[in-house]
Structures are given as structure tokens and as C-alpha cells.
Amino acid sequence: MSSDEKLQILYCSFCGKSQHQVRKLIAGPAVFVCNECVDLCNDIIREEEIAQAGGAQKKLPTPPEIHRMLDEYVIGQEFAKKVLSVAVYNHYKRLGNQTKKDSVEISKSNILLIGPTGSGKTLLAQTLAKILDVPFAIADATTLTEAGYVGEDVENIIQKLLQKCNYDVEKAKTGIIYIDEIDKIARKTDSPSLTRDVSGEGVQQALLKLIEGTVASIPPQGGRKHPQQEYLQVDTSNILFICGGAFADLHKIIQRRTDKSGIGFAAEVRPKEDFSREASKLIKQTEPGDLIKYGLIPEFVGRLPIITTLEELDEDALMRILTEPKNALVKQYRKLFEFEGVEIDFREDALNAIAKRAIQQKTGARGLRSIVEHTLLDLMYDLPGVAAGLRKVVIDSGVIDQASPPIFIYHHEKASRKVAQE
């Protein structure tokens, strides 16, 4: 090789490789950088962005740790908590290792929660986002329609997530989206519809792209106020989607698949009180085929590989929800009354009465606040005016049932006969 040819060979200023050893050499003022070094720099930057965008890579809690933290806010639903702990751990572990070059590509596993109203579906998803410190958004499937129809476009869900993290696209990519009432967009029959289904199958098709991973174009902050601004491009491939629904009568579909008791004279006669317990057992046997028969399209069911069920909360669980979690209702009202310098005491029979009423109303844990709020409305209205000298307010079952007023105990006053009976 002549000296002139040697002088013409260019080298990367970072790794020292020649132009013949790399695919491309980019020239700058008196320096050169090869494509391999550019890729390496991109990987370093991407790792830092993932670490900053929600801390998914920093100190990711293990499944048992996630389960323990869920226990602080959610009562019961042990199986669902175990499933979610593993699923979320694997999802963020996958995100934290995406920059490493590997022949195995791990797919995203979105989650479907099946359970009655007030069983804790939304709270579980919300608490997971809080534990992992990632952006979280809730969408109601019943408000969604196909693009071009009156209603909420499915891509508005991503906009809600962006709003939660101040339009930080990289942070939004590591977020969690919970879509509630997903069972309400099931088509009416398990055969493809010939007519236009604006809020059913069509919405499932639109959500399908979003859930499996697409680049959504979202208006920037301010929206139509700044039409000259470019749309934000959000890749949904790494956003974890959790869908939830009550799926009323799903147990009937499962029963038809599993029931071997026969029909007519051969059928087993069950007492009415066993129906609810039987339905709960059947729901635990849910398979993808049952959801397709219910009205979800096969492609949509396929994008929700992790299916877990939640049980209906009984009286004991509802009483624990009132007192045990970090943000328990009783603790919240105690704090509110503390602001006025007054103590509030909920007797056990009062908690029992609240739980019974929630079961009667079929609202589960979701209805507890409205029952307590309604019970204490008059008391909280008058409290600022009567708080002076008041030491304690006692709430018993009579107050919940509106049969008797709350018991007031003032400073330097002996407990009333009713309170002394404790």
C-alpha cells in the first residue's frame, strides 16, 4: 500500500476503527465518528431517559414487595394482587432491559381484571402506578367511539396520560392506563356485525391498535390554540394497559361450557342462596373463548393475555376497608374532625351497619364513602359552630340507620348514659 493510500484512510476519533471496519463514518470539524459509536451513544441516552421517566429502572420492587405495598391500600383480593405483582414486575423489568441487544424479544403483557362493581379494580391499578411512581390515567370505555363519530376518540386516552406528566413524552411511554367498563363495548352477538357498531366492535378495533403498540399523534399542550405546533408522536408499545369490567352474566357462558349436571329431570336443583357463590366460582374459570362469546373480538382478547378475577367483597372485608388501609375512610374522617379539634369514634356496630348497607346497594367498596358522607352531612355542616367545648362525637348503628342522632361528649362532662354502656 502506497503512502498516499495510507493517508486517505480515515479513522473514528472515538473507537479508532478505520473506515473499512465500519459501515459509515460521519465527518465533523477535524473529527470523525463511526455508526457503531453513534449507536452506543444512543443506547446510553436511552438508558438515562428510561431511568428518569418514572424510575422504572431504579429500584424496581420485587413481586413480594409490590404485593406488600398493595396490602397497605387494598384489602383482600390476594390472588389478583399476586397476579398483578408478577405481571407489573415483568413489564418494567422488560422496559429496563430493552436497550440490551438480545435475540429474544419479550412481548408486552396487558392485563384484564374481571370483578363486580366496587371490588377494587380501579384502586389496584391506581395503587400500582403510585408504587412504581409512573404516570397513570383512567378512561371510561363507555364514552369512547370510533374516530369521526360524536364521542371521545380512543387517542384521547393517551392525551390524558400526557396531561398527567406535563406532556413529557418519554415519561408517558412508561405509564399505566386503566380502561374501565371494558365489558360495555362488547358486541351484542359473537358473530361479526353487518351494521355499524359505533361504540362496540368498532371501538375494540380502534383500541386494539393502541394496546398492541402504535405511534399515536397527539395535539400538543394547548391543542387548537396553537395549530401551528407539530403533533406529539407517542409510541404506545411500552405503555401498560389494564382493562377492567364487571362482565355481568359471564358466569352463564362459563356454566354452559362446564356444566355436566344435565337439563330437565336430570338437572341438579340448587338453592337460590348458592347462586351468587356459584357465579363467583365460575368466573374464576374464565377462558379467552368465554370472553369471545361474551362479545369481545378474538384479536382484542389476544392482546390481554393476563386475565385475573376479583371476588365480591363480603361484610368482613368491607369493615376492614373502612379502618385498615393507609387511606381508610375512618382515618380520613378522624383527620377532618381533628382539624376542628374534635375526636370522632365509629363504634363497631356502626361499621357493620355501613358494610351491610353497601352490600344491600350492591355498590361494594365504592359505595362506602357516599354512605358515610350522607350520614355525617348534617354533623359536618354544624360542626364549625358547635366545636368549641366539644371533645368527642360517637357514631353508632342508630346514626347510620337514621334512628338516633350522634352522641356528643363535651370537655369536663361525664359520658352520657348511652356512651357509658360501652
UniProtKB/Swiss-Prot annotation:
The keyword Chaperone belongs to this UniProt entry's keyword annotation: yes
GO CC annotation, single: HslUV protease complex
Residue ranges annotated for the ClpX-type ZB domain, each copy included: 1-53
Subunit-level organization: Component of the ClpX-ClpP complex. Forms a hexameric ring that, in the presence of ATP, binds to fourteen ClpP subunits assembled into a disk-like structure with a central cavity, resembling the structure of eukaryotic proteasomes.
Protein family membership: Belongs to the ClpX chaperone family.
NCBIfam families for this protein: clpX, PRK05342.1
Entry protein name: ATP-dependent Clp protease ATP-binding subunit ClpX
Organism: Coxiella burnetii (strain RSA 331 / Henzerling II)
Lineage of producing organism: Bacteria, Pseudomonadati, Pseudomonadota, Gammaproteobacteria, Legionellales
